Regions:
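Conserved flavin/dinucleotide-binding core of flavoenzymes
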Residues: 2-38, 141, 234, 283-285, ...
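N-terminal Rossmann-like FAD-binding beta1-loop-alpha1 element of flavoenzymes
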Residues: 47-74
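Glycine-rich FAD pyrophosphate-binding loop
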Residues: 66-90
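A short alpha-helix-loop-beta-strand transition element characteristic
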Residues: 110-131, 199-206, 343-350, 411
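Central helical "cap/lid" subdomain
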Residues: 272-281, 286-346
Length: 490
């Protein structure tokens, strides 16, 4: 990651030197646009477009605009690009503690992986899975857990009902759904209690919701729930590993997708949190910790809740302001435990487990090189509770839970690492922004609508694969086209 930061600062230094040379009347470097109509420097601007956020959405938008001739500056608050992707080195191997997976129906992800010369590996799913349903542990193969037959029937009918309803919610404008106000007036738990009427099934669905959204059904608008499921291809595709949204992961870590785009994205400043955006006539000025920059347009790609912490002048319209105030972020703690052996495989287990009470999910995260690893998510309300506890107490809970499912050998990992996304000051949570009842139907149209010269992107604004890395890339493509249609290219 240090090399990427060096490249970033070198590019920024080069841009400053180029501007200084022009101000002194020097010749433009070869390949630089000549001053003239459409050149931002004629009007004293630093760039055509400023992008706030150096994650997948921001860098995708920036490189698309740079490729069409726009001068672009990316301002990333953290010390490295990546957004909600984060790859760390543990025991000499690289692991993702942020966004990780891709799957069928994600063309932009696979195109970018190929473009950057990266590769993927399938998520390990051979062997039996574990379901900890309200304290009762069972193992099963395939998609169907070993539960009471009546519970299984209710669950299958419930999933069918959910998928049938989510297909009625438009991907582009869920607030235009004929039943939008009705569904946005209740929580996902309200609907489940009225329609599933089985505590075990409700517990299983809530367990899935915690993983997908990082929150509980009681906090989630049913309209938002349905829209997200429709965008992701339905309930089963969102929770499945094999042939689902968790089908494969990037060898060497997903953050490489962001670092690989840096050389294509114009000038990128890290350690530059944005504090204020001012619109003044035909320009915008953006105040960051790395200085103030001016441009014709600004694209904000940070999480919705984080965008609410930026000061805007003039203030945002009521619709946009009310939406951002209501958006929350999911709570997710991602934990890695490395071992000398894949002992769970030797016992015929896949490494996958779900607990409805503990709020945990596990996967086999063993590297292609053979470094044995178990990955655990602590999600939803349990994650918020554990975030407040001492680190050693949290570690003990994680290892006790792994022992509960995989045996005493899980108690002594060779390496242990956790990442609490709610504690990340420039992310605020994971995996996605969530909306309580009464938000999408009333304020949803402000989600993607530009505010003057301010444009919005980020995975939550995507039409397909909302909340996934694919959705972030889609939103970057969409906002780049939006800006290109309005800004004249030199």
């Amino acid at each position: 990651m240090a090399n990427s930061a060096s490249i970033t600062e070198l590019r920024a230094d080069s841009a400053r030197a180029e501007n200084s040379q022009r101000e002194m009347g020097g010749e433009a470097p070869p390949g630089a646009p000549a001053a003239g109509r459409g050149d931002p420097r004629v009007a004293g601007l630093d760039a055509d477009v400023i992008v706030v956020g150096g994650g997948l959405a921001g860098l995708q938008a920036a490189r698309r605009m740079v490729a069409k001739g726009l001068r672009t500056i990316v301002l990333e608050a953290r010390d490295e690009v990546g957004g909600r992707t984060k790859t760390v080195e543990v025991g000499g191997h690289r692991f993702d503690v942020g966004g990780q997976w891709t799957g069928p129906g994600q063309p932009r992800m696979y195109a970018l992986i190929d473009e950057l010369g990266l590769s993927t590996t399938p998520t390990y799913s051979k062997g039996k899975r574990i379901l900890d349903l309200r304290g009762a542990i069972s193992t099963y193969s395939g998609m169907i857990p070993r539960v009471n037959p009546w519970t299984l029937i209710v669950a299958q009918v419930g999933i069918w009902k959910i998928d049938r309803l989510c297909a009625q919610v438009p991907k582009d404008n869920p607030w235009d759904c004929p039943r939008a106000v009705e569904w946005d007036g209740m929580t996902a738990l309200d609907w489940a209690k009225r329609n599933l009427r089985n505590d075990s099934v409700i517990a299983m669905v809530n367990g899935a919701v915690r993983v997908i959204f990082g929150t509980d059904m009681a906090n989630l608008s049913f309209l938002h729930f349905l829209h997200y499921l429709h965008s992701g291809g339905g309930f089963a595709k969102l929770v499945e590993s094999h042939d689902g949204q968790q089908d494969r992961w990037v060898v060497g870590g997903a953050q490489q997708l962001c670092t690989g785009m840096v050389p294509l994205a114009g000038t990128v400043h890290t350690g530059a949190p944005v504090r204020k955006i001012t619109q003044d006539g035909d320009r915008v000025s953006v105040v960051s910790d790395k200085g103030t920059f001016t441009a014709k347009r600004v694209v904000v790609t940070v999480p919705i809740a984080l965008a609410d912490r930026i000061q805007y002048e003039p203030p945002l319209p009521t619709m946009r302001d009310q939406m951002t105030q209501r958006a929350g972020m999911g709570a997710t703690i991602k934990v890695l435990a490395l071992y000398d052996r894949v002992f769970w495989r030797e016992a015929g287990l896949s490494g996958e487990s779900v607990s409805t009470d503990l709020g945990t999910v596990t996967f086999d995260d063993t590297t292609p090189g053979g470094q044995a690893a178990l990955l655990m998510f602590v999600t939803g309300s349990p994650a918020r509770g554990w975030s407040e506890r001492p680190a050693e107490e949290r570690r003990r809970f994680v290892l006790d839970t792994l022992v509960r499912y995989f045996g005493e050998q899980a108690r002594t990992p060779t390496h242990y690492l956790e990442n609490d996304w709610a504690a990340e000051p420039f992310i605020l949570g994971a995996p996605i922004a969530t909306f309580p009842p009464g938000t999408l139907s009333a304020f949803g149209p402000a989600l993607r609508a530009p505010v003057g010269r301010i444009h919005w992107a980020g995975t939550e604004t995507a039409l397909d694969s909302t909340g996934f890395m694919e959705g972030a890339l889609e939103s970057g493509d969409r906002v780049a086209q939006e800006v290109l249609s309005l800004v004249e290219v030199a």
